[in-house]
Amino acid sequence: MNSTFTSQPLLNRSEPRVFKEFYRLVIGCNPAWQVMAQVSLGEILRSKDADAYSCINAKRVDLLLVDGNCRPRHVVEYQRGAHHQGAAAARDAVKKAALRCAGIGYYEVVAGQTTPSDLRRLVEKLVEKPELPICAPD
């Protein structure tokens, strides 16, 4: 291979702060859950319709919340100012429809509008609390 490759950050300049805060909040609610970044929809969605699958295969989500069995449960998209205009809104509509069909929640966090307490309330709503262990009788 004659090509040159270099590494680049997984997240853009504004996303690490949101990722770290979501991670902290999710693990605080249920340590079995995880937050993953920049996940391809083709890895978490399936369709017998090849055309439908090709529409979502290469699309990515900003944050994916998975439960203790690594099942995708919720997607959180981080909307930065100009992101949600024109073609981006159309792409997000395709994501939303596919995720809804699969039973995966879709939520948006808007830069400059979502407060830390908004994030906490969202995570508390989305993440199932761990079941308490049943103590064996003495």
UniProtKB/Swiss-Prot annotation:
Record key words, sorted: Plasmid, Signal
Biological classification of the source: Bacteria, Pseudomonadati, Pseudomonadota, Alphaproteobacteria, Hyphomicrobiales
Protein's name according to its UniProt entry: Uncharacterized protein y4bI
InterPro entries recorded: DUF2726 (IPR024402)
Keyword field contains Signal: yes
Signal sequence region: 1-37
UniProt family annotation: To H.influenzae HI_1631.
